[in-house]
Amino acid sequence: MTTETGTWTVKKGLAEMLKGGVIMDVTTPEQAKIAEEAGACAVMALERVPADIRAAGGVARMADPTVILRIMDAVTIPVMAKARIGHFVEAQVLESLGIDYIDESEVLTPADDLFHINKNDFKVPFVCGARNLGEALRRIGEGAAMIRTKGEPGTGNVVEAVRHARQVMSEIRKLTTLPKEERMSFAKEIGAPYELVCLVAETGRLPVVNFAAGGIATPADAALMMQLGVDGVFVGSGIFKSGDPIRRAKAIVAATTHYNDPKVIAEVSKDLGEPMVGIEIPTIPAEQRMQERGW
């Protein structure tokens, strides 16, 4: 099998086109159209949103290609889909469908508990989750063109996304102050490629776009993550598990765009109906926390 590969620079550029935007999880063509009309920059095609995956338990796999193709036919914006961690054949299938981006996602049950997908083998850009700088740079070293916080998906609780965003940024700040001779030890300490550690030290940021994901449920949540310094947001269960998905979708897009304007955020937050029911993180057993998946 011959694989056409896109260069990492090209794939990174495709991901940068989504900067400042909102990516919404959708399970039907109708939801995809709502997301597009609300101003989403892309949609994530799924059979079940993370809250339903969490509630159902069992093994969560790649969505049925028919579901993905119907969503792709319904909208003109880019469509993403999820593959299991390490499941390179699911990724090959998604690429063959013509998907725009692949999310190697901890929301699905990992297929490989030792290795992630070698993303350099694919022409389609990959997005991967990270809780810290080491995870982010390992994924980029494997070819990821976009990073997102892991958060804790399907909870409607933004606390873990905040923790992961702050952790990455804190480690970047620390790295930029290190003398050059200490960079190799730092790379060893966090388990990251030395060349990428040096690049981050020189630029003061990740070499790819960094979005927030996992628990974003309100316009204020989205604005919070943007003010913390991320490049955009993923919203999973927070829209279509709420009382008024259309209004909430538009409000989250507006809050992401005008994240530094509390008056706009206040205005779009009015009369949105009930948000999704949230889950306190300490009530989730450690073995059921999706953020722990991957390494």
Swiss-Prot record:
Pfam families, A to Z: SOR_SNZ
User: What is the reaction catalyzed?
Assistant: aldehydo-D-ribose 5-phosphate + D-glyceraldehyde 3-phosphate + L-glutamine = pyridoxal 5'-phosphate + L-glutamate + phosphate + 3 H2O + H(+)
Q: Which Gene3D superfamilies match?
A: Aldolase class I
Q: What is its EC number?
A: 4.3.3.6
Q: Which residues are recorded as binding D-ribose 5-phosphate? A: 25, 154, 215, 236-237
Q: Which residues form the active site?
A: 82 (schiff-base intermediate with d-ribose 5-phosphate)
Q: Where does D-glyceraldehyde 3-phosphate bind?
A: 166
Q: Which InterPro entries match?
A: Aldolase_TIM (IPR013785), PdxS/SNZ (IPR001852), PdxS/SNZ_N (IPR033755), RibuloseP-bd_barrel (IPR011060)
Q: Which domain of life is it from?
A: Bacteria
Return the HAMAP family for the record: PdxS
Keyword terms, alphabetized: Lyase, Pyridoxal phosphate, Schiff base
Q: In which pathway does it act?
A: Cofactor biosynthesis; pyridoxal 5'-phosphate biosynthesis
Quaternary structure per UniProt?
A: In the presence of PdxT, forms a dodecamer of heterodimers.
Q: What is the name of this protein?
A: Pyridoxal 5'-phosphate synthase subunit PdxS
